[in-house]
Each structure stands twice: as structure tokens, then as C-alpha cells.
């Protein structure tokens, strides 16, 4: 029957109501979870060559919904030059977790690549890892939610040797919130 779910209750079509439902997020990449206004503010603050107008900015940084699927074009939107300071990285991690909490997510497994955040400025990968974990944990505590982490290795930007070194570095941090690793990037050209 149209408008009803299997149990016979009326379907909920109100987005605000859906946001209140408790949710679990098991596969969220920090690098792709930024709220557009936060990203725009950071781009303008850091003098990136991107449109100041929000509508044009959105076109420049988001994958168009009506486009043909193109994995490499999609990956090209994940720029490494957004982050000029450690504060930028802290702010993004903190704001992203609060945004997820506002969507009703109470448990998150957040993936992030220390390499992605470190590449532009050659930040120390262990410092990045500790910073992201701290920022996300502080936001999670504020929002009353849980967050765990997976460290992402990027097959396009890291050699196997670099991945193993990063793994050993992260393991040496002894942060129990880091529960796994992930392999991401262009699977076709970098199997």
C-alpha cells in the first residue's frame, strides 16, 4: 500500500524526523565529509584559487549528481592543498564529527589518511594521526557519541614500504580507538 511500510505504519518522509533516528556509520572517509560552508571558509582563508561565490565553489569541488560515473574524476575532488595548518586539520575533524552527530549518528568508524592531510606541508604523520583522533574524540564527547578510527593507506600516493612504515608508526601510538586499516584510491591503475 502506497505511503506505508511493511509493518503498516505510515512512512516517514520528513527529513528532520529522519535526522532524529539513531544511526551507525561504518564507512565514512574524513577527507570527503566536510560541510560545504566549512570547506569554503577554509579555502578562502588559505587563499586557494577557487570561486568565492558559493554556487560556483560548489560546482568546483563537488562531483555533479547528474554526471556519468567516473571514479577518477570523483577522486580528483579530494585535494591535498586545503590544509595549510594543523589547526585546519583539527577544525575539519572536529566539525565533521559534530555534523555527523547532528545527523543522528551515534557510532562512527571514521577512516582517514594521515598521508592525505600531511602531503602538502610535509606534516609528521604521527602528529596528524594524534591530532585527528583528539579532535574527533573531543567532538564526540561533546555530542555524546562514539567514534573509532581506521587508518587509510592510499595506493596512489604511498608505496607499499611507506604504508608499512605508517602502520608501524600508528601502531606505536597505542591508541585503542584506532581499530583497523583501510586501502583506498585508484584500484584500476594501482592494484
Predicted regions and their residues:
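Metal-cofactor-binding active-site regions of metalloenzymes
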Residues: 2-191
Amino acid at each position: 500500500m502506497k505511503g506505508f511500510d511493511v509493518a503498516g505504519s505510515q512512512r516517514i518522509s520528513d527529513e528532520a524526523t529522519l535526522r532524529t533516528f539513531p544511526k551507525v556509520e561504518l564507512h565514512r572517509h574524513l577527507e570527503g565529509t566536510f560541510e560545504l560552508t566549512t570547506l569554503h571558509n577554509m579555502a578562502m582563508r588559505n587563499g586557494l584559487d577557487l570561486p568565492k561565490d558559493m554556487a560556483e565553489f560548489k560546482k568546483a569541488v563537488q562531483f555533479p549528481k547528474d554526471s556519468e560515473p567516473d571514479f577518477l574524476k570523483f577522486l580528483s575532488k579530494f585535494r591535498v592543498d586545503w590544509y595549510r595548518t594543523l589547526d585546519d586539520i583539527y577544525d575539519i575533524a572536529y566539525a565533521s564529527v559534530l555534523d555527523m552527530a547532528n545527523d543522528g549518528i551515534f557510532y562512527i568508524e571514521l577512516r582517514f589518511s594521515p598521508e592525505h592531510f600531511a602531503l602538502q606541508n610535509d606534516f609528521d604523520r604521527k602528529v596528524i594521526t594524534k591530532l585527528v583522533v583528539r579532535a574527533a574524540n573531543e567532538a564526540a564527547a561533546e555530542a555524546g557519541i562514539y567514534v573509532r578510527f581506521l587508518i587509510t593507506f592510499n595506493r596512489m600516493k604511498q608505496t607499499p614500504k611507506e604504508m608499512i612504515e605508517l602502520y608501524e608508526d600508528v601502531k606505536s601510538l597505542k591508541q585503542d580507538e584506532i581499530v583497523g586499516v583501510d586501502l583506498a584510491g585508484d584500484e584500476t591503475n594501482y592494484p
